[in-house]
């Protein structure tokens, strides 16, 4: 076992604080509308430029092991905030640094670290209560756009795109962010349900230009097993032909004779038909077929229910206003399923999402939920260079996470104002224990840190900004760092999601309080470099005769 280096008390805290400061100082330059970028070296390819706090934090590794431990604890703050809220990582880092700094000073002055921690926790609970009380629900698309604009660093186009996507696919819908090959950033919205299975034969194609099958007002047959012969389906196929409507068969597979017969009938023009493999595998395939049955108002033909293909009637088939099938995807728009049934199914999937412990299962369930509940939107981020696209994509992802958080828990005035105003709630708390009271005062001072940093990044003195805002009695009065004016933050659309602010403070105080109570640090001693190998060149003289090899 390697020897360990142990540091105690002030020495340990000083080294840890140096690490905290290095990481926090690198991250906090990105805060606010006038925050700067950070350039990060990559082991291969071009360097990456970003304004995303957690991306910067994840890149920092320090040589001194004790400093590095402090930095890694602070990195945990950014990562946790990113996991829970998806944004607010820089705010969380700034808050944590402020609490650790003040806490270290108090410990050095002889205060009890455990009492300080208790005071920090009491104050944070009061701030969170105040934030929840003050949060305003997000009602309109314009408010969603405002949140997106602020989180993407004042880019109104991104805010508008996210609002447009959320309006189309609903709050439950899936919105993904991808890189675009062109210069423009655009939104692609897929309404209805889309799954990644295409037609089983190109002979089903109705639109040769797009190489796609396009049916209006079609029947949908959902079958759990393979379809290998059509004999049992003949009565159903005849009924479909008489109805004059197209038919789409979605089954585990349609093979051999059955597929050939369908293709021949399609080419002769007697039957408008297409066949598609069912999406997913195993149990997930069955669940997705059941989703499709509920969406289209049909029944899943399943052996478990004792159903046979020969007994299927038109009433048992699903219906859809429009079906588009290309080589790789199938999209069903306007399924005939009852709204109440779809809502019940959505509720079941939500319950499964809460119960599951597997990230993979959760992701797949969320995909199913989105497909049933609204649709899918893809924001394709474009730019002149790869570096620009990556930087913009970071901002779009932050903005998207922020808007989702805003929809969940509402919004509060942005630009650090909500935390600054929460000082009033903390100021009302008093404790008989002076060390606990000192912990409360640490949070009281730390609540100013984000707004000070936003002001300083804009080149304005933070103390003046804080003083001016606190002089004004309006709860929504604040500093717009973009224009360097004092405005009504809500009226100007400068807002933060309450969830992001809450999560940032909770995570920052949790890790910072632990750092304040640290009295000893243990790290592995650096090993001395191994002695160099003895020079062996002297004995190789006889190799000189190889000169005639002609290399």
From Swiss-Prot:
Residues binding ATP are 30-33, 51, 87-91, 415, 496
Gene Ontology CC: cytoplasm
Which processes are annotated in GO (biological process)?
protein refolding
Superkingdom is: Bacteria
- Chaperone among the record's keywords? yes
Q: What's its catalytic activity? A: ATP + H2O + a folded polypeptide = ADP + phosphate + an unfolded polypeptide
First-listed, main subcellular location of the protein, grouped into a coarse class: cytoplasm
Disulfide bonds, which pairs? none
Pfam families, alphabetized: Cpn60_TCP1
> Looking at the keywords, is Transcription regulation present?
no
Tell me which InterPro entries the record gives.
Chaperonin_Cpn60_CS (IPR018370), Cpn60/GroEL (IPR001844), Cpn60/GroEL/TCP-1 (IPR002423), GroEL-like_apical_dom_sf (IPR027409), GROEL-like_equatorial_sf (IPR027413), TCP-1-like_intermed_sf (IPR027410)
Localization (cell): Cytoplasm
Record-level Gene Ontology MF annotations: ATP binding; ATP-dependent protein folding chaperone; isomerase activity; unfolded protein binding
Main EC class of this protein?
Answer: isomerase
EC number(s) from the headed UniProt entry: 5.6.1.7
Supply the alphabetized keyword list: ATP-binding, Chaperone, Cytoplasm, Isomerase, Nucleotide-binding
Quaternary structure?
Answer: Forms a cylinder of 14 subunits composed of two heptameric rings stacked back-to-back. Interacts with the co-chaperonin GroES.
NCBIfam families annotated for this entry?
GroEL, PRK00013.1, PRK12849.1, PRK12850.1, PRK12851.1
Q: Which family does it belong to?
A: Belongs to the chaperonin (HSP60) family.
User: What exactly does this protein do?
Assistant: Together with its co-chaperonin GroES, plays an essential role in assisting protein folding. The GroEL-GroES system forms a nano-cage that allows encapsulation of the non-native substrate proteins and provides a physical environment optimized to promote and accelerate protein folding.
Question: What is the protein named?
Answer: Chaperonin GroEL 2
**Species this protein is from:** Rhodopseudomonas palustris (strain BisB18)
Q: Name the encoding gene, please.
A: groEL2
